[in-house]
């Protein structure tokens, strides 16, 4: 048989390895060659088979005709709106907002004025009792001192009023008794005599005792 009658054999090629997603080749990796191994020559009339040589994986190179995927731009995350449902059994959590405000210091002179007026009314009432009636204006005062003097003024006014009523009633009663006693000491005496003319005449003498 001649050389032409021998069957033609196709050269065997190594299948291309598909790239693994997320796999990074190891840097510096070199294939280890077997010691003493030599490729055998093809027999006469057969085409020489290509010798497979393992190449180091120095970074993956895409095969010819492969178009890399175009990376798309990641959209920013959309805001998530969370709704809260009110439950009568579960209290809602609210953020405590603390607001600090500075208030100016206001010096109120009304209390001191009320205290002074209440003291004046209380003192003048000893000379003119009717002035003690002004204590009614200080009974509901916010100042404790003014309220105290106001109450004292009102109490003293009613005490003096009761004393005056008692004194007047006693004086009137005593005056009536004195008048009755004086009336008893006041009397008249009558003496009668006959005159020479035969007529009866009377003389009245009044004696008043003081």
Curated annotation (Swiss-Prot):
Compartments where located: Membrane
Record carries keyword Oxidoreductase: no
Coiled-coil parts of chain: none
Keyword set includes Membrane: yes
Renumbered residue ranges of the record's region Disordered: 1-40
Membrane topology, as annotated: Multi-pass membrane protein
Chief localisation class: membrane
Transmembrane domains' residue ranges: 119-139, 148-168
A GO CC annotation given for this chain: membrane
Top-level taxon of the source organism: Eukaryota
Name by which UniProt lists this protein: Putative transmembrane protein DDB_G0267530
Species this chain originates from: Dictyostelium discoideum (Social amoeba)
Lineage: Eukaryota, Amoebozoa, Evosea, Eumycetozoa, Dictyostelia
């Amino acid at each position: 048989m001649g050389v032409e009658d021998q069957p033609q054999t196709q050269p065997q090629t190594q299948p291309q390895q598909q790239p693994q997603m997320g796999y990074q080749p190891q840097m510096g990796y070199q294939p280890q060659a077997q010691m003493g191994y030599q490729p055998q020559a093809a027999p006469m009339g057969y085409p020489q088979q290509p010798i497979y040589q393992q190449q180091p994986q120095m970074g993956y190179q895409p095969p010819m005709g492969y178009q890399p995927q175009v990376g798309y731009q990641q959209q920013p995350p959309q805001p998530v709106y969370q709704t809260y449902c009110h439950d009568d059994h579960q209290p809602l959590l609210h953020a405590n907002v603390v607001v600090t405000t500075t208030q100016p210091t206001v010096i109120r002179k009304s209390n001191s004025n009320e205290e002074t007026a209440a003291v004046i009314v209380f003192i003048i009432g000893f000379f003119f009792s009717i002035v003690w009636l002004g204590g009614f204006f200080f009974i509901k005062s916010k100042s404790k001192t003014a309220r105290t003097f106001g109450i004292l003024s009102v109490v003293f006014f009613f005490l003096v009023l009761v004393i005056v009523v008692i004194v007047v009633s006693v004086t009137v009663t005593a005056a009536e008794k004195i008048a009755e006693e004086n009336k008893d000491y006041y009397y008249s005496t009558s003496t009668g005599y006959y005159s020479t003319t035969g007529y009866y005449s009377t003389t009245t003498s009044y004696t008043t005792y003081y």
